[in-house]
Design a protein with these regions (language model features):
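Extracellular N-terminal segment of 7TM GPCRs
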Residues: 1-32, 195
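Seventh transmembrane helix
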Residues: 108, 248-254, 258-265, 271-319
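Membrane-interface helix-loop-helix junctions at boundaries between adjacent transmembrane segments
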Residues: 91-101, 111-143
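Intracellular signaling interfaces of 7-transmembrane GPCRs
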Residues: 44-54, 121-138, 211-239, 297-319
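Structural signature of the GPCR N-terminal helical module
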Residues: 24-84, 108-118, 244, 250-252, ...
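Extracellular-loop-to-transmembrane junctions of the mid-late helices
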Residues: 153-159, 179-209
Length: 319
């Protein structure tokens, strides 16, 4: 089962520069945001010589996202200004690193959602109570397991599988000055297999954990509303805000997984427009999700405001 398409690839240099500017802005914002997350969580680790599970997950998540954003920025820059990257071993390395870091991002985010669900949700089932008691001991093993799973499945992209049965001997550069015809055949069975093994497990974990957490928060919020005596209940309002934030996280996560699947499968390689959309969409999730994490965490939010004030003072002194 293969899908074939012939298409022309043209370059519009000003548009290419615009794409690079947008992608670079997203990546720099993401790197700064995740750098703040990493710095805020590293300091107590160094001071106290100990780290909580939540801190460990946030550290791994921020490191993987900084690496991912850096690879996207380098790859986009090379694709515009230098074509030789796509004829060398470095191209294969960049693609494997891209997939590995993206898988790690998906797994770490899913495990963060799972950890919050177990810690926050209120269910009386015996299995859930036992899991709540043991979750702190299980999470380090789950984190290491997710890293090995991500590394294992990213190795499938070492040998020409990232472009999924491209009839041409080399990958094309969508910003090439010379117009040319390319033919791409996408093996649907192979792509679905990779999706099922690499992307689907963390996606299922994240959706299940987030949905159950929203259900638990919603049930507790309704209980507080029935038992409340005043017109306004700050605790209930905080629960409703947590439900909205959790739902927003889930929508961002699903959108990123879908965009990654489409990008990896070459389904829209026949469309220059959709290639551009994916190039812009992929780095937006790590940046946006990290900013939301900062906004919802008092310590991270305080560090973010301090950085903003320092940048503002620096700009005032220079200009």
């Amino acid at each position: 089962m293969a899908q074939s398409s012939d298409y022309w690839i043209y370059e519009v240099p000003p548009f290419a520069i615009l794409i690079l500017t947008v992608v670079a802005t997203e990546c720099l914002i993401g790197i700064i945001a995740n750098g703040i997350v990493m710095a805020v969580n590293v300091v107590p680790w160094v001071q106290k010589k100990a780290v909580t599970i939540n801190t460990k997950i946030l550290l791994l998540l921020s490191v993987s996202r900084i690496g991912f954003q850096s690879i996207i920025l380098i790859e986009t820059t090379f694709s515009i200004f230098k074509d030789s990257l796509y004829d060398s071993v470095s191209y294969c390395f960049s693609k494997v690193s891209f997939v590995f870091l993206n898988y790690c991002d998906l797994w770490f985010t899913a495990l963060l959602s799972f950890f919050h669900f177990v810690k926050i949700a209120n269910f009386s089932y015996r299995l859930f109570l036992k899991l709540k008691w043991r979750i702190s001991g299980l999470m380090p093993w789950l984190l290491w397991l997710s890293v090995f799973i991500s590394l294992g499945f990213s190795m499938f992209f070492c040998k020409d599988t990232y472009t999924v049965y491209n009839n041409n001997s080399r990958s094309f550069n969508i910003f090439n000055f010379t117009a040319k015809v390319c033919k791409v055949e996408t093996n649907v069975v192979y792509v679905v297999s990779l999706f099922s093994l690499g992307l689907l497990p963390p996606l299922i974990v994240s959706i299940a954990a987030t949905t159950l957490l929203i259900f638990s928060l919603r049930r507790h919020s309704l209980h507080m509303r029935h038992s409340a005596t005043g017109s306004r209940d700050p605790s209930r309002e905080s629960h409703m805000r947590a439900i909205k934030e959790t739902g927003c996280f889930l929508l961002l996560y699903i959108s990123n997984a879908v965009a990654l699947f489409v990008y990896m499968s070459n389904v829209v390689n026949a469309s220059f427009f959709w290639n551009v959309v994916l190039r812009i969409a992929l780095p937006s999730y790590p940046a946006g999700h990290s900013i939301l994490l900062i906004q919802n965490n008092p310590g991270l939010r305080r560090s973010w405001k301090q950085l903003q004030s320092q940048v503002h003072l620096y700009l005032q002194s220079r200009f």
